[in-house]
């Protein structure tokens, strides 16, 4: 495992751990609401995909919180890899209800396969050499996040317009946030990235949740 070099001040790490700790708590509560709503208003695909999506939210925010909370060098290095890997997990997790419930059919399954295969590839890439994978990972995040544009027409036939709007806004928050994520040298930029991540997650969560109420 590569030696970890501390990059953030104590103040930054407190902000980073607290912000995503709150995100973890909200993810747990939100997942319960989502699954119950799916059980009432959707079918088996809605419930299963909600479980997968909710789990990806909880895991990402938990891993990020742990990474920014620990000070032990070896422990922090391990959770840094986990933190980066769960970004791929969340992207694929978010796509799961979109592809399996809203899109469904051939288009949904093809997109599901592409996104999850990309996520697995990214996780393996990060696990082998996180430093060398950092820049390629950023491009993978963006590519995976916006591949939905190729299926936007059939998606909007099965998703209410408000959900589509929230989906786009969430994607914009994530994408703009990557700018702050990529620039490591400026103090508190990573913390700003955390805020953009939470905002993106909130919009995507409600995009999926509100769509479940469509009759």
Model-identified regions with their sequence ranges:
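Multi-pass alpha-helical transmembrane bundles in non-GPCR membrane proteins
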Residues: 1-215
């Amino acid at each position: 495992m590569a030696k970890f070099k501390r990059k953030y001040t104590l103040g930054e790490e407190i902000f980073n751990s607290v912000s995503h700790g709150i995100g973890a708590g909200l993810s747990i509560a939100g997942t319960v609401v989502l699954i119950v709503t799916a059980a009432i208003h959707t079918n088996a695909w809605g419930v299963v995909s909600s479980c997968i999506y909710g789990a990806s939210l909880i895991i990402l925010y938990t891993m990020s919180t742990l990474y920014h909370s620990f000070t032990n060098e070896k422990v922090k290095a391990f959770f840094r890899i986990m933190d980066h890997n769960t970004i791929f997990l969340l992207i694929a997790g978010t796509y799961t209800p979109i592809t399996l419930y809203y899109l469904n059919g051939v288009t949904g399954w093809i997109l599901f396969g592409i996104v999850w295969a990309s996520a697995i590839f990214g996780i393996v890439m990060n696990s082998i050499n996180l430093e060398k994978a950092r820049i390629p990972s950023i491009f993978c995040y963006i590519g995976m996040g916006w591949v939905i544009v190729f299926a936007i027409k059939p998606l909007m036939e099965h998703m209410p317009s408000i959900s589509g709007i929230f989906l786009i806004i969430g994607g914009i928050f994530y994408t703009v946030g990557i700018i702050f994520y990529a620039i490591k040298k400026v103090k508190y930029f990573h913390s700003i990235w955390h805020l953009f991540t939470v905002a993106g997650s909130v919009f995507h969560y409600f995009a999926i949740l509100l769509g479940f109420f469509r009759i």
